Amino acid sequence: PERLGIYQSVGDTAGPGGAMRALRTIPMYVEIAQAIRAYAPKAWVINYTNPMSLCVKTLYYVFPEIKAFGCCHEVFGTQKVLKGILEETMGLKDVKREDIQVNVLGINHFTWFDYASYKGIDLFPIYRKYTEEHKEDGYKEADKNWANSTFECAHIVKFDLFRKYGLIAAAGDRHLVEFMPGVG
């Protein structure tokens, strides 16, 4: 698509890449829903495949009584960013991502936190101050695992959106710009 002037940072949810992925994936999800209806109609289905919302919608279209929901790992990544900022700014050690409480809003790859706390500490003022102090250089991930390198970014788009809207964008910059052309 790029040679035609269509740019996509990821292409698994939105744009032509998302449409192509949906066309490839939906037929498989029809078969999955039929198999669940036939062999395990009481099972819960947890979907991590993209385009997530279309995959889950297909399951319900084929088998309306199915118990299914979709998840995205991006929320965990943003909890890790909050963990790192908390450790860096407050001098805390060994903060566990799982101990950061959040309220998640939105759709896959375009999720937001309107609440974030750690052991009773409201993280919004800490995050606000950090985004102001690091609006140019962003946040550098402490995780140097090569398997996570494709998700690495400085979170500058995330910081900018927080300053504009007052909510923490809970997806990586590469996904956020899919939904907001011209940002970043």
Positions of predicted regions on the chain:
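Generic detector of bulky aromatic hydrophobic side chains
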Residues: 1, 18, 24-27, 52-56, ...
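A sequence-composition feature that detects small, non-aromatic residues
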Residues: 14, 19-22, 33-43, 68, ...
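Long, compositionally biased stretches enriched for glycine and/or charged residues
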Residues: 87-184
